[in-house]
Amino acid sequence: MAVTMRQMLEAGVHFGHQTRFWNPKMAPFIFGHRNKIHIINLEKTLPMFTDAQKYVRQLAANRGTILFVGTKRQSRDTIAQEAQRAGMPYVNARWLGGMMTNFKTLKVSIKRLKDMEAAVESGETEKMSKKEALLFEREIAKLQKSIGGVKDMGGIPDAIFVVDVGYHKIAVTEANKLGVPVIAVVDTNHSPEGVDYVIPGNDDSSKAVALYAEGVADAILEGRANAVNEVVQAARGDDEYVEENA
């Protein structure tokens, strides 16, 4: 479903940071300021968000993987929830350096986590001593928190969706190094450089974060649904062609 200007206003997408903290590279997206707070121009944000959704829709239709990244307290739960709804991987605890540029190491940790989860399911942990079980529980909890969201990613994603580029500059840098497209929310205190699909907007409000994440997840689900419909229609077309020539 398309996001409207009214929804953006209600979510506070237009509220930037204090004027003294601004990044001049965001000047083209700033409408003005009120009470020493920059006001983002939603007439710029809305079409740019729509473009980002269009790209995401196409990527999802081609079975692409989009990694959701949002580790700030106010975005953690929403990022996990919307990524899961869209069937996409996510990082919502801490970005571990090398998550993309050193994917081989991440794969080792993922294997360890999956082996541990399998041990729990098979009842293997019941044979452990109290101390062993406690250490096991601590390790599996730590792994689930840090990499649980990417355990089924399978490889480097086709794009990343980031809320707050300043807070996640390592993730953006890694994506840039690998040529992975970056879709990101950029507030008035950060630079849009290194971002392929810039969404100028408030990156602190939980309502605004929910609007972005839901919009991206919706676009993914729409892209997948469109791809399925095309396959069904193509199959029907083939059947009709066979009938005509029978």
Curated annotation (Swiss-Prot):
SUPFAM superfamilies: Ribosomal protein S2. GO terms for biological process: translation. Keywords: Ribonucleoprotein, Ribosomal protein. Pfam families: Ribosomal_S2. InterPro entries: Ribosomal_uS2, Ribosomal_uS2_bac/mit/plastid, Ribosomal_uS2_CS, Ribosomal_uS2_flav_dom_sf. Coiled coil: none annotated. CDD domains: RPS2. The keyword Protein transport does not apply. GO terms for cellular component: cytosolic small ribosomal subunit. One of its GO terms (molecular function) is structural constituent of ribosome. It comes from the Bacteria. HAMAP family: Ribosomal_uS2_B. PANTHER family: 30S RIBOSOMAL PROTEIN S2 PROKARYOTIC AND ORGANELLAR (PTHR12534), SMALL RIBOSOMAL SUBUNIT PROTEIN US2M (PTHR12534:SF0). Belongs to the universal ribosomal protein uS2 family. This is Small ribosomal subunit protein uS2. It comes from Burkholderia cenocepacia (strain HI2424). The lineage of its organism: Bacteria, Pseudomonadati, Pseudomonadota, Betaproteobacteria, Burkholderiales. The gene is rpsB.
